Amino acid sequence: RPLLTDEEFGSAQASTLSSHYTPETVIRNMWSALEYLGFKGGKILEPAMGVGNIIGFMPEKISRRSRISGYELDSIPGRIAKQLYPDANIKIAGYETEFHPNTKDAIVTNVPFGQIAPIDPALDKTLRNKLKGAYNLHNYFIVKGLLELKPGGVGVFITSSATMDGRNSKAREYISGLEVDLI
């Protein structure tokens, strides 16, 4: 506590319910899946960066051919990520602050979990109506990520089983209506 400002302490405290750091073996498998699918580089987004572990374990051959951007809501891990990856465009802000449809070649993330989705000025009305009862934090990150992928882009999302087998099917129905291939 003595090392943090009141604002930083509040931010760290608020993120304890939705933050989770992805193990290295999982991250390496995420990148292996992208390579298997033929991904060689491009515009990559990590919308829930933490300290940037997913970027840190990116294979060098992909990294050399990529432009990386990311978002981290919590200022402490966001500042760490900025120090570790100075060439990446990392914003210490919520993913809901901007929307860039059809612009990313790959999205690689372990989505945050929670029952309440952020208020996104660009997507809020559409998604709240279409995902009735299933508009939560992890479904928001997945759907927005899919909308930001270019045609032919690849997304690797770590999520809970509730995304695909939860009682409320609205998110699955919306995702299946998008022009994406799910693997």
Task: Go through each PLM region and give its residues.
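A short acidic, Gly/Pro-enriched loop at the edge of an enzyme's catalytic core
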Residues: 99-108
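Conserved Class I SAM-dependent methyltransferase catalytic core
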Residues: 75, 133-183
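General small-molecule cofactor/ligand-binding pocket signal
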Residues: 69, 91, 183
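Conserved SAM/SAH-binding loop
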Residues: 92-98
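Mobile active-site "lid"/loop adjacent to the S-adenosyl-L-methionine
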Residues: 111-141, 163
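Conserved acidic residues
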Residues: 42, 105, 181
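Glycine-rich, phosphate-binding/catalytic loops in enzymes
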Residues: 62-63, 87-88, 123-127, 172-175
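Class I S-adenosyl-L-methionine
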Residues: 1-84, 88
